[in-house]
């Protein structure tokens, strides 16, 4: 085997080149590491040995014929042959002739806000990581020592930045690269800022709704970005003290794809239009969703039995996109248990929403005061008078259900087991009713009577007996409750523009006399004791009604202590013309 020989002149040349490269690798600062470029074409080649502090470009540029911006970038590399290294917090003083071209190269080891200041007006263009995508940084307000055209990047990611400068006039130029935002000394930046983040889990659909309060500082110019981080045993939580760290962690998860569009990774995050829902990539642990001025976001494709940490950042549009951390929260994305209902308590529950079905649970007490077979009584009052159905479940098996009802209704559940837990599922009777079926009032009791609620009759209809020009007589079935009881008749005036009783029926309002008078469109009210009649029929005449008007009438049963319960609402339509006082209509 022959050993290859090398000429002495070639060995000296290689030794000189290696010593120059080694000297270039050593010369760097902690905040910004620079590599001396011997030739402009070296920018387009990947180095053989990567610098651990500065990541190389992760995107392979597209061919020049397919990407005009890359073609222009390569042309600028040839035209701007005068190269100068730029370091963070180290000013550069140079003298430039008119129309002289200068190229600055800045390498960042860490993501940070970046401000580049010029002492004189110059033309400038900035590129990130040799991708050929020109950045569009915001301008810095001119001031002492800061000329018009200075640049600010709210978040400069790790990597190489090429800054091409064209002098407009002859003279001295000072260039400063500062690792801070020009608004970093804003007095409110470190002020106490308490904002609540609320979440709603939909584990079956792998969805989560995130809502938050608006910013207390300059809310009219504040935009929001939500950072979602999935936590696991393999990937512990990363603490983001600023928005740049979150963007850096997000971009490190995936290589940048070649693109001819202007702007860097941060502009791609901010530039995405706000959407009502956003699908998360389950292969990534960090996600960033910017919502603009919207203060809620629907997230999809979450992983069950996982924990998520939410960081909310504000983007101040009036201060050059200054970012500040507003709030944080941690959520366990597990199946939530149904809300447990309490006995002898009238509770208002939500039954609407995108699901259309809501489930609540209740437990039969271990010991009951009943002598015979144990049972449970349910009082159900649809708030808006919409038709709903109820199903009773035990261990996922249906043990009872009701027909559609729209007024106060009692259900007697027999054959219950003491100590067992049951589920109560509400759902609208049809798709049309789903628009109005939003809330329902529920009361449970294992006794024959509700302690603080009056008993309503089986038929809760209120009848319109007779209507005259300015009066109406109504009747209803008396309560079977033997306790001391009274009735209140409450009249609301329906507005002329909309006389639909559907829009104004509300069985869940506070019918306490002192409070019901505060409601809108309240017209008249009277309360009296029950009447003694053989058929247990109660009647009342309502006076001073206006011809041509429409009224919504409620009758409530009231105990001396406790909450009143309403009968079914009645609508009165008064005739618009009345020839004499004897004119009347019967129903």
Swiss-Prot record:
<comment type="function">
    <text>Secretory protein that acts as a feedback regulator of dpp/BMP, wg and hh signaling pathways. In the developing wing, is a dosage-dependent modulator of dpp/BMP signaling involved in wing growth and crossvein patterning; low levels promote and high levels inhibit dpp/BMP signaling. In the early pupal wing, inhibits dpp/BMP signaling activity to prevent the formation of ectopic crossveins in the posterior compartment. Binds to dpp and gbb to modulate their release and activity decreasing dpp/BMP signaling in the responding cells.</text>
</comment>
<dbReference type="InterPro" id="IPR045805">
    <property type="entry name" value="NDNF_C"/>
</dbReference>
<dbReference type="InterPro" id="IPR036116">
    <property type="entry name" value="FN3_sf"/>
</dbReference>
<keyword id="KW-0964">Secreted</keyword>
<keyword id="KW-0677">Repeat</keyword>
<dbReference type="GO" id="GO:0097367">
    <property type="term" value="F:carbohydrate derivative binding"/>
</dbReference>
<dbReference type="InterPro" id="IPR019326">
    <property type="entry name" value="NDNF"/>
</dbReference>
<feature type="glycosylation site" description="N-linked (GlcNAc...) asparagine">
    <location>
        <position position="129"/>
    </location>
</feature>
<dbReference type="GO" id="GO:0008586">
    <property type="term" value="P:imaginal disc-derived wing vein morphogenesis"/>
</dbReference>
<keyword id="KW-0272">Extracellular matrix</keyword>
<feature type="glycosylation site" description="N-linked (GlcNAc...) asparagine">
    <location>
        <position position="334"/>
    </location>
</feature>
<keyword id="KW-0325">Glycoprotein</keyword>
<protein>
    <recommendedName>
        <fullName>Protein NDNF</fullName>
    </recommendedName>
</protein>
<dbReference type="Pfam" id="PF19433">
    <property type="entry name" value="NDNF_C"/>
</dbReference>
<feature type="glycosylation site" description="N-linked (GlcNAc...) asparagine">
    <location>
        <position position="459"/>
    </location>
</feature>
<feature type="glycosylation site" description="N-linked (GlcNAc...) asparagine">
    <location>
        <position position="109"/>
    </location>
</feature>
<dbReference type="InterPro" id="IPR055271">
    <property type="entry name" value="NDNF_Fn(III)_1"/>
</dbReference>
<dbReference type="GO" id="GO:0090090">
    <property type="term" value="P:negative regulation of canonical Wnt signaling pathway"/>
</dbReference>
<dbReference type="GO" id="GO:0030514">
    <property type="term" value="P:negative regulation of BMP signaling pathway"/>
</dbReference>
<dbReference type="Pfam" id="PF10179">
    <property type="entry name" value="NDNF"/>
</dbReference>
<dbReference type="GO" id="GO:0005615">
    <property type="term" value="C:extracellular space"/>
</dbReference>
<dbReference type="GO" id="GO:0036122">
    <property type="term" value="F:BMP binding"/>
</dbReference>
<dbReference type="GO" id="GO:0031012">
    <property type="term" value="C:extracellular matrix"/>
</dbReference>
<comment type="subunit">
    <text>Binds heparin. Interacts with dally; the interaction promotes dally degradation. Interacts with dpp and gbb.</text>
</comment>
<dbReference type="GO" id="GO:1900115">
    <property type="term" value="P:extracellular regulation of signal transduction"/>
</dbReference>
<dbReference type="GO" id="GO:0140032">
    <property type="term" value="F:glycosylation-dependent protein binding"/>
</dbReference>
<keyword id="KW-0732">Signal</keyword>
<feature type="glycosylation site" description="N-linked (GlcNAc...) asparagine">
    <location>
        <position position="321"/>
    </location>
</feature>
<feature type="glycosylation site" description="N-linked (GlcNAc...) asparagine">
    <location>
        <position position="190"/>
    </location>
</feature>
<feature type="glycosylation site" description="N-linked (GlcNAc...) asparagine">
    <location>
        <position position="558"/>
    </location>
</feature>
<dbReference type="GO" id="GO:0030198">
    <property type="term" value="P:extracellular matrix organization"/>
</dbReference>
<feature type="signal peptide">
    <location>
        <begin position="1"/>
        <end position="24"/>
    </location>
</feature>
<dbReference type="GO" id="GO:0030513">
    <property type="term" value="P:positive regulation of BMP signaling pathway"/>
</dbReference>
<dbReference type="GO" id="GO:0090255">
    <property type="term" value="P:cell proliferation involved in imaginal disc-derived wing morphogenesis"/>
</dbReference>
<feature type="glycosylation site" description="N-linked (GlcNAc...) asparagine">
    <location>
        <position position="498"/>
    </location>
</feature>
């Amino acid at each position: 085997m022959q050993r290859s020989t090398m000429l002495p002149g070639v060995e000296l040349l290689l030794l000189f080149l290696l010593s120059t490269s080694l000297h270039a690798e050593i010369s760097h600062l902690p905040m910004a590491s620079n590599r001396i470029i011997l030739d402009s074409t070296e920018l387009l080649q990947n180095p053989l040995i990567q610098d651990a502090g500065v990541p190389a470009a992760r995107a392979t540029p597209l061919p020049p014929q397919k990407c005009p911006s890359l073609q222009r970038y390569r042309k600028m590399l040839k035209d701007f042959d005068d190269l100068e290294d730029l370091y963070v917090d180290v000013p550069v003083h140079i003298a430039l002739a008119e129309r002289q071209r200068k190229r600055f190269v800045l390498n960042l080891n860490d993501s940070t806000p970046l401000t580049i200041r010029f002492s004189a007006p110059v033309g400038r263009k900035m590129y990130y990581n040799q991708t050929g995508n020109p950045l569009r940084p915001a301008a810095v307000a001119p001031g002492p020592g800061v000329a018009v055209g200075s640049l600010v990047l709210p978040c400069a990611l790790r990597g190489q930045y090429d800054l091409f400068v064209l002098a407009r006039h002859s003279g001295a130029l000072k260039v400063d690269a500062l690792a801070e935002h020009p608004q970093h000394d804003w007095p409110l930046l470190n002020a106490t800022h308490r904002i609540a983040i609320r979440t709603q889990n939909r584990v079956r659909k792998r969805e989560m709704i995130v809502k938050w309060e608006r910013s207390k500082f300059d809310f009219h110019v504040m935009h929001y970005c939500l950072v979602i981080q999935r936590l696991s045993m393999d990937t512990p939580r990363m603490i983001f003290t600023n928005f740049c760290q979150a963007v850096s962690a997000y971009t490190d998860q995936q290589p940048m794809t070649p693109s001819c569009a202007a702007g860097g990774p941060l502009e791609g995050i901010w530039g995405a239009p706000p959407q009502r829902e956003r699908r998360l990539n389950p292969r990534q642990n960090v996600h960033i969703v910017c919502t603009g001025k919207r203060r809620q976001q629907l997230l999809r494709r979450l992983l069950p039995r996982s924990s998520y940490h939410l960081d909310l950042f504000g983007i101040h549009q009036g201060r050059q996109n200054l970012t500040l951390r507003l709030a944080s929260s941690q959520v366990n994305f597990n199946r939530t248990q149904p809300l447990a209902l309490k006995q002898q308590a009238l509770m208002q529950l939500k039954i609407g929403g995108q699901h259309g079905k809501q489930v609540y649970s209740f437990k039969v007490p271990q010991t009951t005061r009943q002598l015979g077979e144990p049972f449970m009584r349910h009082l159900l009052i649809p708030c808006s008078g919409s038709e709903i159905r109820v199903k009773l479940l035990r261990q996922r098996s249906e043990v009872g259900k009701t027909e559609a009802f729209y007024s106060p209704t009692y259900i007697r559940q027999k054959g219950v087991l003491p100590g067992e837990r049951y589920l109560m599922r509400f759902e609208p009777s049809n798709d049309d009713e789903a628009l109005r079926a939003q809330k329902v009032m529920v009361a449970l009791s294992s006794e024959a009577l509700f302690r603080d609620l009056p008993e309503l009759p089986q038929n809760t209809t209120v009848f319109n007996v007779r209507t005259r020009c300015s009066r109406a007589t109504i009747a209803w079935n008396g309560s079977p409750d033997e306790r001391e009881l009274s009735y209140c008749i409450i009249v609301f005036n329906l507005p002329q523009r909309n006389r639909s009783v559907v829009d104004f029926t509300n069985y869940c309002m506070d019918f306490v006399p002192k409070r019901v008078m505060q409601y809108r469109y309240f017209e008249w009210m009277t309360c009296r004791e029950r009447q003694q009649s053989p058929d247990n029929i109660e009647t009342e005449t309502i006076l001073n009604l206006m011809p041509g008007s429409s009224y919504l009438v409620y009758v409530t049963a009231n105990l001396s202590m406790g909450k009143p319960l309403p009968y079914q609402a009645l609508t009165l339509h008064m005739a618009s013309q009345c020839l004499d006082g004897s004119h009347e209509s019967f129903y």
